[in-house]
Amino acid sequence: MTKTYHIAVLPGDGIGPEVMAQASKVLDAVRQRFGLKISTSVYDVGGAAIDRHGSPLPAATVAGCEQADAILFGSVGGPKWEHLPPAEQPERGALLPLRKHFKLFSNLRPARLYQGLEDFCPLRSDIAARGFDILCVRELTGGIYFGQPKGREGQGMHERAFDTEVYHRFEIERIARIAFESARKRRSKVTSIDKANVLQSSILWREVVNGIAADYPDVALSHMYIDNATMQLIKDPSQFDVLLCSNLFGDILSDECAMITGSMGMLPSASLNEQGFGLYEPAGGSAPDIAGKNIANPIAQILSLILLLRFSLGKDDAADAIERAINQALEQGYRTADLAGDGHAIGTHEMGDIIAKFVVEGV
């Protein structure tokens, strides 16, 4: 019997509902083509939930997500809610509690320069011509952002502030396995980022990663200091496949990877727990300035659906079909405004229609 999967859909604010509608079209297309049984339920989140329910993350939304196999998340936030206390604003009041509630410890951020989009890459033309396809695997719940003690004390010239970088062996082991398993599905290369020439936490990080690597003899492992990695990403990003990073280093490198692709509209992300449950979302923001204008790029949301199909549902064939459809659309010159330059731009809805059509046709 074919298993039925259930996705909790949280469109959110700004361009979220528009781009989510395009991902839903593409999901309908893979259902049709592959006979998948995937149901969806839509829930309020972020500013939209504040307006309707008085909370950025209503209990009904959390309950709906608990009943799902994965969460497809849009985007939250906007000027309308910036007057609220920080903990009640859409970003802090919705996304962070969801990550904590579902124990999402790993963040996966693909960054790829698609053929035909080299002119949007800020790197030198000969570097961009080589292309790149990088997956940044970032540990989300440990490290200096959460380590104790942290705080400020003293006064005057003796005032000081302090944070503590703490990593446990189990935290490093589980994120390392995510990186190695991901590399097996890609080009079988992991570059682990640390500062083991200075930091005790990085020395442990490197030791543990080396130990995990023994279980993956088919995956090549190398180590790189964070300062060198930031330089190498600019010098030759094509050398990288999977980047394995701590929380702080992953925060830095994932944004650098995003920048060199040339468009936030092409960047998905996934946050996973140990059971494979995940929250999938575009890496960009809610872009309230272009909401409702049919000009937002929906590809990041559709790429987030691809990650969901791969990592939470195990439907690689459906994910591959969507990926081919996106490639076909771009190769045929279809562009939303962020990618069109001086050329012809199509709208958000049109891009969704074209990609869904190519999925059904089996390009």
From Swiss-Prot:
Pathway: Amino-acid biosynthesis; L-leucine biosynthesis; L-leucine from 3-methyl-2-oxobutanoate: step 3/4. It catalyses: (2R,3S)-3-isopropylmalate + NAD(+) = 4-methyl-2-oxopentanoate + CO2 + NADH. The gene is leuB. Its EC number is 1.1.1.85. GO terms for biological process: L-leucine biosynthetic process. Substrate binds at R99, R109, R138, D227. It comes from Yersinia pseudotuberculosis serotype I (strain IP32953). Signal peptide: none annotated. This is 3-isopropylmalate dehydrogenase.
